[in-house]
Amino acid sequence: MAAAVRFQVVRALPMSRPAISAAATSVFCSSSHRQLHHAVIPHGKGGRSSVSGVVATVFGATGFLGRYVVNHLGRMGSQVIIPYRCDIYDTMHLRLMGDLGQLIFLEWDARDKDSIRKAVQHSNVVINLIGREWETRNFDFEDVFVNIPRAIAQASKEAGVERFIHVSHLNASMKSSAKSLRSKAVGEKEVRTVFPDAIIIRPSDMFGREDRFLNHFANYRWFLAVPLVSLGFKTVKQPVYVADVSKGIANATKNPDAIGKTFAFTGPNRYLLFHLVKYIFGMTHRTFIPYPLPRFVYSWIGRLFGLSPFEPWTTKDKVERIHISDVMATDLPGLEDLGVQPTPLELKSIEVLRRHRTYRWLSSEIEETKPAKTVNY
C-alpha cells in the first residue's frame, strides 16, 4: 500500500523539461552505442541549401537563357543578384530557383552607371546575358550588344569582380550580313578591351521550351508553306540545347582554366536547314511544303514585318541570321572542356514541339519521326 502511495506521489510531481531530457538521455545512453559505417551516411553536394561561394549578378536573367542560368546557379548554392527592368511580376518564376534569401532582385536602368555599379558591387561573378531579337526606338543593336556590355564590364572591373562572363553568338563577325551579329562582334571586342580576363561564350542557335528557333519554324504551319532561301540547301545549322549552355556557364564560374578564354557552345550534330525544318514538321505531324524565295524578297518581307509596333513575326535581320551557316569553331574550346556533354536535338525537340501537334498526334511516340540527316561540313 505504501509503495502504491509512493508511486502516486511521484506521478503527481510535475517534471520540468530538463528532467524529462535527463530521463530520456539516461534511457538511451544505457544501451550500447550503435556504430554506422561512413558509406551509410548520405554524402554529396548540399544543393540549393549549400554555399558555393559564388555571388553572381546575372544581367538578362528574365530572358530565355537567363532562367536556366539562374536555376543552375541556385542549384549549386549560389547567391544571385537579379537586376530587372520589367514588371516585378515577370520575375516571379525565378523566385523558386534559390533557397530563402539567396535570390536578390534589384531594379536597374541600363543607361544609369550608378545602378550598374550598385548591382555588381558585392559580386565576385558577373554574367551578361542581355540580348534582343529586334531593334526598338529605345534600344538599337548597338545599345544592346555594344554600349550596355561595355558599361557592365567597366563597372565590374572597377568593383574588383573576379570573373566576367559575356554571352555573344557563334556567328558574330564584323563581316556578317546581319546587323545584330556585327554588333555582337564589336561588343566582344569592347568587353575584351575593358575586361581582358573576361570569359566570352559563343553559343549557336539555342533550342528549348521557350525558344525562338524551333518554335519559329513550327509556327510556319499557319502560312501553309515554308519560305526558305535556296530551299535551305545552302545553310548549315548546329543548334545547341539551352540547358547545356546554362550548365556550361555555371561551370565556367568555378573552372580556373576558363579565365580569359572564348568558348564555342554547339550541339553534337550539323544539319542542312532544309532537313532540319523537315524534321520539325515531321515531329509535329504537319505537312511540310517548302518553296524557294529569293533573299532580297524575303528581306523585304522581313522589313515590312519589322515595322510592327508589337513583337514582329520576323525582321530583315532575322532573315539574314536564319540563312547564315554556323561556323565550325574547331579551334575554340567547347562544352566538353567545361564538363558538359552536348545533348542531341532529337532527344529534346519533343519538349518544344509537342504543343504544335494536333490532338490526334499529341501522345504519339517520337520514334515515329525519322531523324534529320546530318552533314559534316
Curated annotation (Swiss-Prot):
Lineage: superkingdom: Eukaryota
Q: What is its main location?
A: mitochondrion
Give first and last residue of the transit peptide: 1-35
Look up the record and give one Gene Ontology term from the biological process aspect: ubiquinone biosynthetic process
Q: Where in the cell is it found?
A: Mitochondrion matrix
- Sites bearing N6-acetyllysine, chain numbering: K189, K370
The note on the cofactor says: Binds 1 FAD per subunit.
Gene Ontology terms for molecular function: NADH dehydrogenase activity; protein-containing complex binding
What Gene3D superfamilies does the record point to? NAD(P)-binding Rossmann-like Domain
- Gene Ontology CC entries for this record: mitochondrial inner membrane; mitochondrial matrix; mitochondrial membrane; mitochondrion; respiratory chain complex I
Q: How is it modified after translation?
A: Acetylated on lysine residues. BLOC1S1 is required for acetylation. Acetylated by CLOCK in a circadian manner.
N6-succinyllysine: modified positions? K175
Q: Which InterPro entries match?
A: ComplexI_NDUFA9_subunit, NAD(P)-bd_dom_sf, NmrA-like
Record flagged with keyword Transit peptide: yes
Name the needed cofactors.
Answer: FAD
Q: Which UniProt keywords apply?
A: Acetylation, Electron transport, FAD, Flavoprotein, Mitochondrion, Respiratory chain, Transit peptide, Transport
Keyword Electron transport in record? yes
Q: Which CDD domains match?
A: NDUFA9_like_SDR_a (cd05271)
Tissue specificity note? Expressed by the principal cells of the epididymis. Detected in flagella of epididymal sperm (at protein level).
Family per UniProt? Belongs to the complex I NDUFA9 subunit family.
Role played = Accessory subunit of the mitochondrial membrane respiratory chain NADH dehydrogenase (Complex I), that is believed not to be involved in catalysis. Complex I functions in the transfer of electrons from NADH to the respiratory chain. The immediate electron acceptor for the enzyme is believed to be ubiquinone.
UniProt subunit comment: Complex I is composed of 45 different subunits. This a component of the hydrophobic protein fraction. Interacts with BLOC1S1. Interacts with SLC2A4. Interacts with CLOCK. Interacts with RAB5IF.
What's the protein called, per UniProt? NADH dehydrogenase [ubiquinone] 1 alpha subcomplex subunit 9, mitochondrial
The primary gene name is Ndufa9
